[in-house]
Every structure is written in structure tokens, then in C-alpha cells.
UniProtKB/Swiss-Prot annotation:
This is DNA-directed RNA polymerase subunit beta'. Zn(2+) 1 binds at residues 60, 62, 75, 78. It comes from Corynebacterium jeikeium (strain K411). InterPro entries: DNA-dir_RpoC_beta_prime (IPR045867), DNA-dir_RpoC_beta_prime_bact (IPR012754), RNA_pol_asu (IPR000722), RNA_pol_N (IPR006592), RNA_pol_Rpb1_1 (IPR007080), RNA_pol_Rpb1_3 (IPR007066), RNA_pol_Rpb1_3_sf (IPR042102), RNA_pol_Rpb1_4 (IPR007083). Its EC number is 2.7.7.6. It comes from the Bacteria. SMART domains: RPOLA_N. The gene is rpoC. GO terms for biological process: DNA-templated transcription. It is an enzyme of class 2 (transferase).
């Protein structure tokens, strides 16, 4: 078989009939499948052993040859080759068709490739293929011209004969009439009788004339049709066609069905057609030119690829291997079969019937009908339901055709090639494992035994517990005691991978060291929950076992949980204390007064009566006092410390040369805070203060920036232990009695009720309208809610557990306390409008029926939104991954001098608005500048270089830039990166997940997609209803989708295309806005601007107001409220402008939700959206005008053309939505597995596309190592050379007496804990 590692490209093309016959092992002639009595495949049927191979290994069909020794022999009795039955998965057959049929993909696809090639409308094509019309395939122009006069004379003669016949008939009838009238006259009949006879005769004579006229017209039509007859002309009238055939068959050929199409294709001159189309494109205009362009695309594709267009019409069709369309016996003797077998049977039945009819010489009309049915059955086999009603099976279910097997989530691509079920895996419910270290997980014994079964069995045999593998297997199945000891050894230092679905970002799969636990639930470390988004309300997780040494090494070094503390999206630590741990540490670091519990033994200065109280010579002494109950945990004390580094101020004051370990200093603190600082590294400056969630987070952020990962991992583990310990001892619980209700609440509400009644009265008297009443009531009750809420907040004492949980940042917010104890306030209905009756009760008091009903609107909408959001967010992630999956770091530095200018600092102004000389950080520097390399020197105002070109901007450099007052810097950006496919390490900058320069091979595209998609679920499905402001303002997830799909926004705002002064004219419902450009060029006029949408606002001196007459606007500025159209921004501001616009707009949505994502992730996606350009003038290059090409390819082709003295290509920048950009990717495998599978494959086959296998998806599909991470070529084929020490150690056993071997301080050596990445030389 073909090995995937030995090819670098995969091409798809059109198969000709000869190809299909070459693939085939024999013709399938019968529609039978298997014999119902013997259950053996029928000969020449769809499961025939002679064609597809034996059903049993090394055994022919009749049983004459059995066993492997007859390998390769073909049995002379039954004709079956003796081989493995696996060949039934790869051997193909074919069906020889009695009449050619067209391939439905090329005829029915949009656009119709057959139609474009032959210049026929799809409707006409359908009529021809399905035998509803005839088409002329060739005309003997010369013969017709030579014989035209003779033929015309014959035709005139025939017409004359018709006229003579008509005249003779008329004369006869006239004579008969005369005789009849004479007879009547003789009989003395009345006038009425005569009139009747006269009328009857007139009528008959009129019919005679009309019949003759029709005949003459018919002859004229036949003649005119014949004279103008041209190839590809369609004749719908069958009678005329038959007449033409009878009279002039020597001068033309024609036909109907796929046969006629085949004849046309065979006589089609591709080169001549391409030349004539190019001429039309050169000289033509309008629709004609457009159609020529579209046709040229198809014609040029066939010319360029060397595909034979005749492949679009099939003379024989392939039959896929039987194991891919199996038939299985069910209980009760019935069979379940793949739909394909039914579809193949229909084709074979109709084909055999057609053969029989042709042999019998059946009438043409019957044969044509049978051919049409054959065409329809082949269509159904290839793509059921594409044309007409689908073929259905039992229960009216449409049968799954070959196309359906590839399409969609259940298709071959997404179900079996991109995602496979894997062995060595298991799943179970998760529970918390607070005793675990960060790099450990608890694995249930039974699950571990099943996962590690082969390893355990091997060891049982090695250790002579079992004689052979079979008995070892039996021991494992019976769970003998010795099995557990061996299992312990097998799992030691063998990491497992845990995964929780949905895996929204790369931290959804992490590696852990397994620890065997009783029970059947997997134990998860509490700090790993954030990354997995796991909780313990019944969540399940899957376990996977890395088998090979390489896989284990990757799991340990790259995926171990303790190496993945930072978020790849923002670079912030994810393994933070949460919930109980926060409460515990908050409680530990509180400060209490001496009279409160926990504040006893506080510091008191010396008096005349005695020495100072609460002064301790060491931490040990303070702990002793605490143990005796003399000292409270939160009491302020003075304690002498020598093992912890002092705060920065104390260090500067007492130790100007720097503090050394062992030097003592006096801390004014509490015992709890000293214990907290003991958890941090000893040389980290002492942290003083109450540690709520935010201060804890900033400490861990700081640690992550300054210390190796291993130290951070150990520290957060200690924080976790201490957090749980003190949370338990704090005794924080919530009861109904802790919820305090405002005593004077009723009075307050009565007061607001009176105000509400006043508003209602005003409305009744007509003083205010409905909208004003609504707004007044909303404002009034919001004020009431805030007042009650604030009063409730002030009512709670500090030691009440409810505000304690909120203030510590463990859970909830003050708003929820208002709801619990104050009043719920205003709620919205399903349309998002406020209900003007507020909910006045709190949950503690209980809601009335009406209030409960009003409240349920919003709750239901919330639930519906959440469900929709999850699906939408998942689909967004999928599209983002698809568009960016081939963006991989390909080289260290692309050498570009370009970059993006980003703000760093803004000057601080005094009260009068004058600069003070100080600077503060610009907004969002952490997500824009941090972690990037400079593209040019960053210099202070006096010219000194603060950070040199090519240096990275880290936290220290950022601080230096701020102090020097550097307002903006030019940084390297992926959007200006010159690497052809992918990006370079320098333009990307630091990896957010490691804090170091990104490594070559990192799949930054997928990381970017995950970073944007993962918080997608948190974004709301928000559409704001701001009464009458140009409809709705889209926000949240829909806005992000709108931006990435480059859609025109609903409330679109025009943008200024020049700098200039604004003039506003006010019409009834619209504004007319004129800009007088600064450069004196013609005025730019914007007409019919909606008043409802409202003019955009200008921010001047901290005040926002709408644009006014005479204001100055800058190019690209919005003129109305709403959102700008990205396509317009591209036109006005160019590529750089639209890039910045998209990044800012996406960030705006995420920042609203408090989600931090680094700009570089969004830049990668935007870069992919702007990759393509449209060719306007192809110059001397191969490109077709109007085609979309890669920007890099266009630049390269232009350079090449100019070098050889030609003209460069002229292009226009395009912005494509992510879906369109994914489908326009170079890789057809990736595009086909994304969406519109059949369309992509049709196009790829016609163009004979080659897939260079650059991205990740295409390599996953064919089963190759992905070209990213450790799979890139420079890391392949690395073998480990053991050192002499390692060789020696391999043959010596460690002594089991040495205590140090198992001691805890050998962290990272034998404990299976994380080893800092810096210590391992990966190269």
C-alpha cells in the first residue's frame, strides 16, 4: 500500500472511462448481492468474490484452496484469488453502461461546468440530457451549400404540389356545393336550408385552405431550420427534427441525451474556443464580457490541467469495494445493507434492461425512455436529490448517495478523517482532588488497569508472575493482588491526557501524572478547572494514553498541566485560586480590631505600666502564641522576619545594597499575612494587605513574569492548599438569617410609588407622550433600585458572610445581594424592553405571582440565548480554525522593514488641560504592544534609544518607554510579515503561553482561532433596542460574526472619503451632508442620510456631541451612528486602514465583556481575510482578469514579468469573509472538508488541483504527521543518543534504602513533576 510519508502532494482530476476500467478488477453484470440460502456472494454480482476478492482470509470461493500456502493462486473452479479478505476494502469493479450518461456534478453544479464549456444554458442542457429536446452535433456546411439550389427547387416543387392539391380539393368542393344547391332549388327548399349547406361548404373550404397553409408553413419552417442549421442548435419540436432527419440526414448529425453531449465534447476545440473568448474579453463589454470571462475560466482549466472534458460524460461507472458498502445479517435472518447497494442495483437493473432492448431492436421512443431512466439512476447514485425528487428507501427516507457519504458532519471527511475514535481511552465523571499536585490527576484503579492492560501484561510476564501473555491476560481479568503492584509500576512516570468536551482551546487537553484512586471517578486538580471550564456537577472527562516514547515526551514536556499555567489568548495565568480558595486566603489576610474575634493579642505600644504587646522575635514565636490562643490570626502585630524578603520600600531604606537571606527586619503585619507570604517564593517582595481575588491575581501574574514555570506551579499549589485549609477554618456559610432586610424599605417604595403616580397622571392629561412616560418610569425605578440596593449594602456588617464572599471576589457581586435582600428592580420582556412595573420584593421576602411572571420573561430569554450562543460560538470557532489552520511559524525572521505603529503612552494633563510632563500607559497596551519586536528604534524626545530595533517589548521595556515618554512605537506585526505561507517568529513576537519568542513550527493560526472562539460563549446574543436609533445596534457574538464575515452592517454608516469641512442640509426625513475637501478638490456629497440613525458623535475636550455644520472631519471618520462597512473602509483607507478597523471593532466587543485577547490573534485572522486580490488587468502574466489570486503570488508573478520585459499584473485589494476565505484556500482537501464539499471537489477535479499538504487539516486527513510543533521536518527523525552515565544507569538498580530517592525535595527528578522547559535542550 501507498505510504503517506513518501509523497508531498496530492492531486485530484477527472477520470476517463479507461482509468475506471484500469482500476477495476472485473465487470459487475448482475444486481444480485448474496445468495439468501448459502449467504455466499453471487457470481458477477455486487459482492462477487471473483471481482473483489475472497470473503475469508486465504480461502477461495468454493473451498478448494485453503491456507496461506496457496497465496496468489487463482482457483480454476471458481476463479477467486487466494489472498487476504482485506482486499475487499480496496478492490473496485465497474459497470459497462449501454448508453453514455453525464456526471451530475458537472452538469447540475453551480455554475454548470458542462453548460459553460458548450455555451448552453443549464435549462437547455437538462432538456437534451433527459431526452426532452434534440441537439445538432455537426453540419456538413459545404455539402449543404453545394446542394442548396437543388434542395430548394425540390422544396418549391413540394410546396407547389401542396398548392395544386389544395386547388383541386377546393374545385371539387365547389362543384359539390353547386350540385347540392341545384338539388335544393329543384326541391323548392327554403332559404334556411340553402344557407346551411352554403355555410357547411364554406367551413370545409376554409379548413382545406388552412390545412394547406399549415403544411406550407411547416415546409417553410423545415427549410428555414435546415438552411440556418448550426452545431449546438437545439430543436425542441420532435416532428420537425424527424422531418429534418428524413429529408436531409446526409447533411447533419444530431441526437439527444448524453450521447449527443459526448459527441459535442469530442469535437470541441478547446484552444480555438479559448482564443475567441480572449478576443471577446479584449473587445467586449457588459454581460457579454462577463459571460466570456466565466466561460474562459472553465475552458482554460481544461487546457491548463490537460484533463479530457470527455470525462464529464461516463461510458462506465466504478463500483466501490464491497466492504465500504457492507451487508450485515441481523437477528431473524433479515439483512441490513448500505443505501449504495440499492442505488447500484437500480443502475444495473436499468442498464441490463436497456441492453436487452437494444438487442431486440425496440422502438426509439422506448429506448430513449430507458436511457433517461438509466441517466436518472446514475444521478441518484452520485448525488441523490440534486435533481428532482430524491430516490427514497423504506419509510420515505432519501437514500444516501456517494456525495452524501462525503458531506456534512456525519460525512467521511468530518466523521472519519478529521476525527476518529481512538483506542487506549476511557471516560468517567470527575470529582475534585484537592490533595493532588498540579501535575497529577486521580485515575480510578479499574480504568487504569484497562488502559494500561498491555503494559501490565508485559510486566507480569517479565517478572515471572505469569508464564505467557495469555495467562497474564487471565490474571489481569481476574484482578489478582499482584496485578495492582505491577500496575503501580506501569503508571509511574507515564503521563495520561485528560480532555473535557467541548475542547474550545488547546488547554482543553492537558497531560497529568496518574495517581491510582479508589472509586470510579476521575479526580481533577482544582486549579486545572478554569482551563477545562470544568465543574463537579456531573461533568465527564475522557482519558487518553500516549503510547510511544515520543508521545510520552511530548505529553510531559509540552502538555503537562504545570507547564500550561498561562492562557495562550492573553498570557495571563489561568491556574488561579478560585471560589473557596479565594475565600480562605482573604480570611487569612484580613485585619481585625482587638475587640473582634481573631483580633486578640494585637500590637500595643509600651506604656509606663509595661512593655509593648504583640511584638514577636520570630514567626515561630507568633505561631506558638496563636496555638495557645493568645494571638488572633488577623490581629495587627510586629514580628521580626529573616527568611522573607522585605517590601521594596523597606529594602530601599534598610538594605541599600540589597537584602540577603538571613538579614532581619521588622514587619508590621498580621500572622495570617506572614503565613500567606510564606507560600510565595522566599525572594519575592513581602506582600502586605488584604488578599482578595484581584490582588491574588496580580501576585500570580507577577510571579509568572519573573519566575520559572515550575516555581509558579509550586506556588499556586501551595496557595490552593492554604486556601482550602483556611476556608474550612473560616467557617464561612450562608443561612437565611444572614440575609438582612432593609427595615425602612416600605417607606422608600411608597415615596417612589407616589412619584410614579404623578408620571401616570401627566400621561393621562396628555402632558407627555408614551415614549416619555416609558423613559421617565424606567429612570425612576432604576433610581429606586439603586437607592434600595445602596442602603442594603450599607446595612451589612463586615463579618457577615454574604458580603465577605463578594468582597473577597470568590463569587457573586453586589447586584446579586441587592436582588437577594433589597429589590430585584426592572426586568425586560422577550423583546428586550423594560416592563414598567418593577419587582419590588427581594428573593428573601418572596415574589408575588405577577412579579414572578414578569421575571420569567427575562429568565426564559436568557436560557434560550445561552443555547443559541453555544452553537453559534462553536460554528464561529470552526470557521476561524478553518481559515487560519495553515498559518504556522515557518522561519525565524522574514527580514521585512515594515510594521504597525501602536500607541504606548499618553501625556497626563493638568486641570487646565496642559501637559504635566508625566505619561500614563495608553489604553490596552498589554494586548497591543507587549510581547512584540520593534521594527525601528524607540527613541525619547532627546534622541536616546530606549529600546533598539529588533528587541522585544517586555514588561521592563514597557516601563522604560513610559518613563521616557515615548508616545508610539513601530512594532513588527503578522499583517506586514513577508513570509509566504505562514508567518515568521519575529513578526509574531512572544508566544503568550510561554512568555518566550514563539518557536518555529508553532501553529499560531489555530491558537489565534481558539483564542477568539473560546470566549465566544461568554459574549451575549446582544441586539440593543434603542428606540428608533436606526433600528438595532448589533453587539456581542453577532457583531463578531458580522465583522469576520465582512458583511455589510444593518445600520450602515457612511465614512468620510476625504479630510474636510462638513456642511449639513436638513431635509424632511433625511440629512444631506457635503464635505468640502481641504485640498480644494470637488465636494463630496452624501445624500439621503437617515435622521432616525442620527449623526455620529465627535469627542471634543472630553464632551461628546453630534457632528455640526462647519465641523472638520478626517478621512475614514464615520458620519452617522452605527457601524462602517468594511468594504468601504478598504476602498477609502486601504489595506492597513481596514485591518486596524477590524481589530478595533472586534476588540471592542470582547473588552465590553471583560475578555482579554492579544491583538496578534485577531491580526492573524484579518491577514487571512485580506490575502486575496482581484486581477483587473493580467498584464503579461498567466492570470485571468476577474480571478481571485493570492497577494503573494501576484507580487511574485509581476516581478517575474517585469524581469522578462513584460507588464506587471494590476490588482485590487479584496476583503473576504472567513467562510469564503476558507473555501478559497489553495488546499482542496481542506476546503472540501469544511463546507460545500461537492462544489469544491468538482472545481478541484476540473482544475486538476494539487494539494501541497502545507496546512494541518490536509495532513490529518491523509494520516500524516502535521507540519507543526514537533511534526515539522526539522524535528523529524531525531533519535536520542544516551550518555555514558545513562548507559551505566540503565543496567544498575537504585538502592531501595536511600531515603533521598523518595524525598520531596528532589522535585522534578523522580516525582514526575514538571521540569522547567529552559532546562531541556530541545534542539
Amino acid at each position: 500500500m501507498l505510504d503517506v510519508n513518501f509523497f508531498d502532494e496530492l492531486r485530484i482530476g477527472l477520470a476517463t472511462a479507461d482509468d475506471i476500467r484500469r482500476w477495476s478488477r472485473g465487470e459487475v453484470k448482475k444486481p444480485e448481492t448474496i445468495n439468501y440460502r448459502t449467504l455466499k456472494p453471487e457470481k458477477d454480482g455486487l459482492f462477487c468474490e471473483r471481482i473483489f476478492g475472497p470473503t475469508r482470509d486465504w480461502e477461495c470461493g468454493c473451498g478448494k484452496y485453503k491456507r496461506v500456502r496457496y497465496k496468489g493462486i487463482i482457483c480454476e473452479r471458481c476463479g477467486v484469488e487466494v489472498t487476504k479478505s482485506k482486499v475487499r476494502r480496496e478492490r473496485m469493479g465497474h459497470i459497462e453502461l449501454a448508453a453514455p450518461v453525464t456526471h451530475i456534478w458537472y452538469f447540475k453544479g453551480v455554475p454548470s461546468r458542462l453548460g459553460y464549456l458548450l455555451d448552453l444554458a443549464p435549462k437547455d442542457l437538462e432538456k437534451i440530457i433527459y431526452f426532452a429536446a434534440n441537439i445538432i452535433t455537426s453540419v456538413d456546411e459545404e455539402g449543404r451549400h453545394n446542394d442548396q439550389s437543388t434542395l430548394e427547387a425540390e422544396m418549391l416543387l413540394e410546396k407547389k404540389e401542396v398548392e395544386q392539391e389544395r386547388d383541386a380539393e377546393l374545385a371539387d368542393r365547389a362543384k359539390t356545393l353547386e350540385d347540392d344547391l341545384a338539388e335544393l332549388e329543384a326541391a323548392g327548399a327554403k332559404n334556411d336550408a340553402k344557407k346551411k349547406v352554403q355555410n357547411a361548404a364554406d367551413r370545409e373550404m376554409r379548413h382545406i385552405r388552412e390545412r394547406a397553409e399549415r403544411e406550407i408553413d411547416r415546409l417553410d419552417e423545415i427549410w428555414n431550420t435546415f438552411v440556418k442549421l448550426a452545431p449546438k442548435q437545439m430543436i425542441v419540436d420532435e416532428n420537425i427534427y424527424n422531418e429534418l432527419v428524413d429529408r436531409y440526414e446526409d447533411y447533419f448529425t444530431g441526437g439527444m441525451g448524453a450521447e449527443a453531449i459526448q459527441t459535442l465534447i469530442r469535437s470541441f476545440d478547446l484552444e480555438a474556443e479559448a482564443e475567441s473568448l480572449r478576443e471577446v474579453i479584449r473587445d467586449g463589454k457588459g454581460q457579454k464580457k462577463l459571460r466570456a470571462l466565466k466561460r474562459l475560466k472553465v475552458v482554460a482549466a481544461f487546457l491548463r490541467s490537460g484533463n479530457d472534458p470527455a470525462g464529464m460524460v461516463l461510458d462506465c461507472i466504478p463500483v466501490i469495494p464491497p466492504e465500504l458498502r457492507p451487508m450485515v445479517q441481523l437477528d431473524g435472518g433479515r439483512f441490513a445493507t448500505s443505501d449504495l447497494n440499492d442505488l447500484y442495483r437500480r443502475v444495473i437493473n436499468r442498464n441490463n434492461r436497456l441492453k436487452r432492448m437494444l438487442d431486440l431492436g425496440a422502438p426509439e421512443i422506448i429506448v430513449n425512455n430507458e436511457k433517461r431512466m438509466l441517466q436518472e439512476s446514475v444521478d441518484a447514485l452520485f448525488d441523490n436529490g440534486r435533481r428532482g425528487r430524491p430516490v427514497t428507501g423504506p419509510g420515505n427516507r432519501p437514500l444516501k448517495s456517494l456525495s452524501d457519504l462525503l458531506k456534512g458532519k456525519q460525512g467521511r471527511f468530518r466523521q472519519n478523517l478529521l476525527g476518529k475514535r481512538v483506542d487506549y481511552s476511557g471516560r468517567s465523571v470527575i470529582i475534585v482532588g484537592p490533595q493532588l499536585k498540579l501535575h497529577q490527576c486521580g485515575l480510578p484503579k479499574l480504568m487504569a488497569l484497562e488502559l494500561f492492560k498491555p503494559f501490565v501484561m508485559k510486566r507480569l510476564v517479565e517478572k515471572s508472575y505469569a508464564q505467557n501473555i495469555k495467562s497474564a491476560k487471565r490474571m489481569v481479568e481476574r484482578q489478582r493482588p499482584e496485578v495492582w503492584d505491577v500496575l503501580e509500576e506501569a503508571i509511574a512516570e507515564h503521563p495520561v491526557m485528560l480532555n473535557r468536551a467541548p475542547t474550545l482551546h488547546r488547554l482543553g487537553i492537558q497531560a497529568f501524572e496518574p495517581i491510582l484512586v479508589e472509586g470510579k471517578a476521575i479526580q481533577l486538580h482544582p486549579l486545572a478547572c478554569e482551563a477545562f471550564n470544568a465543574d463537579f456537577d456531573g461533568d465527564q472527562m475522557a482519558v487518553h494514553l500516549p503510547l510511544s516514547a515520543e508521545a510520552q515526551a511530548e505529553a510531559r514536556i509540552l502538555m503537562l498541566a504545570s507547564n500550561n499555567i498561562l492562557s495562550p489568548a492573553s498570557g495571563k495565568p489561568l491556574a488561579m485560586p478560585r471560589l473557596d480558595m479565594v475565600t480562605g486566603l482573604y480570611y487569612l489576610t484580613l485585619l481585625k480590631k482587638p475587640e473582634e474575634f481573631g483580633g486578640q493579642g494585637a500590637y500595643a505600644p509600651a506604656t509606663e505600666d509595661g512593655p509593648a504587646q504583640g511584638v514577636y522575635s520570630s514567626l515561630a514565636e507568633a505561631i506558638m502564641a496563636y496555638d495557645r490562643g493568645v494571638l488572633g490570626l488577623q490581629a495587627p502585630i510586629h514580628v521580626r522576619i529573616s527568611h522573607l524578603r522585605p517590601t521594596a520600600e523597606i529594602e530601599a531604606e534598610l538594605f541599600p545594597d540589597g537584602w540577603q537571606r538571613g538579614q532581619t527586619w521588622l514587619a508590621e503585619t498580621t500572622l495570617g499575612r506572614v503565613l500567606f507570604n510564606e507560600l510565595l517564593p522566599w525572594n519575592y517582595p513581602y506582600v502586605e494587605g488584604v488578599m482578595a481575588k484581584k490582588p491574588q491575581a496580580s501576585v500570580i501574574n507577577d510571579l509568572a513574569a519573573k519566575y520559572p514555570m515550575i516555581t509558579v506551579a509550586q506556588t499556586v499549589d501551595k496557595l490552593k492548599d492554604a486556601g482550602f485549609y483556611w476556608a474550612t477554618r473560616s467557617g464561612v456559610t450562608i443561612t437565611m438569617h444572614d440575609v438582612l432586610v432593609l427595615p425602612n424599605k416600605q417607606e422608600v417604595l411608597d415615596n417612589y410609588e407616589a412619584k410614579a403616580r404623578v408620571i401616570e397622571k401627566k400621561m393621562a392629561r396628555g402632558k407627555i407622550n408614551e415614549a416619555e412616560r416609558y423613559q421617565s418610569l424606567v429612570d425612576l425605578w432604576k433610581e429606586a433600585t439603586d437607592y434600595v440596593g445602596q442602603s442594603v449594602e450599607d446595612l451589612y456588617p463586615d463579618d457577615n458572610p454574604i458580603p465577605m464572599i463578594v468582597k473577597s471576589g470568590a463569587a457573586g457581586n453586589m447586584r446579586q445581594i441587592w436582588t437577594l435582600a433589597g429589590m430585584k428592580g426592572m426586568v425586560t420582556n422577550s423583546r428586550g424592553e423594560y416592563i414598567t412595573r418593577p419587582i419590588k420584593t427581594s428573593f428573601r421576602e418572596g415574589l408575588s405571582v405577577l412579579e414572578y411572571f414578569n421575571n420569567s420573561h427575562g429568565s426564559r430569554k436568557g436560557l434560550a440565548d445561552t443555547a443559541l450562543r453555544t452553537a453559534d460560538s462553536g460554528y464561529l470557532t470552526r470557521r476561524l480554525v478553518d481559515v487560519a489552520q495553515d498559518v504556522i511559524v515557518r522561519e525565524d525572521d522574514c527580514g521585512t522593514k515594515q510594521g504597525a505603529v501602536v500607541p504606548v503612552a499618553v501625556p497626563v494633563l493638568d486641570a487646565e488641560g496642559k501637559p504635566t510632563g508625566n505619561y500614563t500607559a495608553a489604553d490596552f497596551v498589554e494586548t497591543s504592544v507587549l510581547g512584540r519586536y520593534l521594527a525601528s528604534d524607540a527613541t525619547a524626545s532627546d534622541g536616546t534609544v530606549i529600546v533598539a530595533e529588533g528587541d522585544v517589548v517586555g514588561e521592563g521595556e514597557l516601563q522604560a518607554l513610559l518613563e521616557a515618554g515615548v508616545e508610539e512605537v513601530k512594532v513588527r506585526s503578522v499583517m506586514t510579515c513577508a513570509t509566504n505561507t505562514g508567518v515568521c517568529s519575529t513578526c509574531y513576537g512572544r508566544s503568550m503561553a510561554t512568555g518566550k519568542k514563539v518557536e518555529i513550527g508553532e501553529a499560531v493560526g489555530i491558537v489565534a482561532a481558539q483564542s477568539i472562539g473560546e470566549p465566544g460563549t461568554q459574549l451575549t446574543m446582544r441586539t440593543f433596542h434603542l428606540g428608533g436609533v436606526g433600528g438595532d445596534i448589533t453587539g456581542g457574538l453577532p457583531r463578531v460574526q458580522e465583522l469576520f464575515e465582512a458583511r455589510v452592517p444593518k445600520a450602515k454608516s457612511p465614512i468620510a472619503s476625504v479630510d474636510g469641512k462638513v456642511r449639513i442640509e436638513d431635509d424632511d426625513n433625511f440629512f444631506t451632508l457635503t464635505i468640502e475637501p481641504d485640498d480644494g478638490s470637488d465636494d463630496v456629497v452624501y445624500e439621503k442620510l437617515s435622521k432616525r440613525q442620527g449623526l455620529a458623535t465627535l469627542g471634543t475636550g472630553g464632551v461628546e456631541r453630534p457632528i455640526r455644520d462647519g465641523d472638520h472631519v478626517k478621512m475614514g471618520q464615520q458620519l452617522l451612528k452605527g457601524a462602517a462597512d468594511p468594504h468601504e473602509v478598504l476602498r477609502v483607507m486601504g489595506r492597513r486602514g481596514v485591518q486596524q478597523h477590524l481589530i478595533n471593532e472586534v476588540q471592542k466587543v470582547y473588552r465590553d465583556q471583560g475578555v482579554a485577547i492579544h491583538d496578534k490573534h485577531i491580526e492573524i485572522i484579518v491577514r487571512q481575510m485580506l490575502r486575496r486580490v482581484t486581477v483587473i488587468d493580467s498584464g503579461s502574466t498567466e492570470f485571468l482578469p476577474g480571478s481571485l489570486v493570492d497577494h503573494a503570488d501576484a507580487v511574485a508573478a509581476s516581478k517575474e514579468a517585469v524581469k522578462t520585459g513584460g507588464r506587471p499584473v494590476e490588482v485590487r485589494a479584496e476583503i473576504m469573509g472567513i467562510t469564503k476565505a476558507s473555501l478559497a484556500t489553495e488546499s482542496w482537501l481542506s476546503a472540501a472538508s469544511f463546507q460545500e464539499t461537492t462544489r469544491v471537489l468538482t472545481d478541484a477535479a476540473i482544475n486538476k488541483r494539487s494539494d501541497k499538504l502545507i496546512g494541518l487539516k490536509e495532513n490529518v486527513i491523509i494520516g500524516k504527521l502535521i507540519p507543526a510543533g514537533t511534526g515539522i521536518s526539522r524535528y523529524r527523525n531525531i533519535s536520542v543518543e544516551p550518555t555514558e552515565e545513562a548507559r551505566a544507569a540503565a543496567y544498575s538498580l537504585p538502592s531501595s534504602f536511600g531515603d533521598g530517592f523518595y524525598a520531596d525535595d528532589t522535585y522534578g527528578e523522580f516525582t514526575g513533576a514538571a521540569v522547567p522547559l529552559d532546562d531541556i535542550d530541545l534542539m
